[in-house]
Amino acid sequence: MLVLLSPAKDLAKETPSVKDTTQPVLLEQAMPLVAKLKTLSAKKLASLMDLSLKLGELNRERYAHWVTPFTAMNARPAVFTFNGEVYRGLEARTLSSEDLRFAQHHLRILSGLYGVLRPLDLMQDYRLMMSTPFGLDRRKNLYAYWGDRITEVLNEDLKTSGGSAVINLASSEYFKAVKPEKLTGRVITPIFKDKGPRGYSVVMVYAKQQRGAMARHIIQHRITEPERIKEYAGDGYRFAPDESSADEWVFLRDKRPPLVPRKLEGGRIR
């Protein structure tokens, strides 16, 4: 069984050191993308990625310093580097070494630049969302660039993990880079909904946190059979069979905590 997550825009400033790191499987395919990104100015990067000029300059510097081979001196493990809501739910820094070993076999992070990452794959800081209108040659976007490659890697990983299911905890933007019809495993997508004045609906900040929290639950409980996911009851959610379909499993929560404003890049408040 494999679990899929999206990456995050926010990256951690500091990460713990890890001995047994690995290299991204599709690193060679990332190199042509970086080569082209290196030619873009901060202004062009900001325009391409819909960023402030300050963040455009940050990413220009990132790509200018992007170099292989990846080592512990110039790169960091992916699971500790991403720092968005999903990864606040995952809390990778508090996972045990045994947890990380299980995650290395069963957790995959989809990426616009790296294609697909294992938790302990080294990566250098970047910003390149899968939906960015950026490609190479006649391939006009990243979906066309990656083509079947991501799906092929996932199929190999499914074979290695000995499972026949993919738990899709990634966003639709990233899962669009996977071709479900070519996957050798069944795809199950958990959906998290909170009760509001007009009934149950997806509250994105909570949904993202729960994607990470469910991934953590799967890792810590060594779950390899999809049916066991229905036992998940984190943060007040419960599986709702009447609201679910065969491949979309809905989890409902009746009472949600108040949203706390959080600072984003550039000091903005959400």
Task: Describe these PLM feature segments.
Residues 92-260, 270:
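Internal, well-folded beta-alpha domain core
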Residues 4-94:
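Active-site helix-to-loop segments that bind/position phosphate- or nucleotide-bearing substrates
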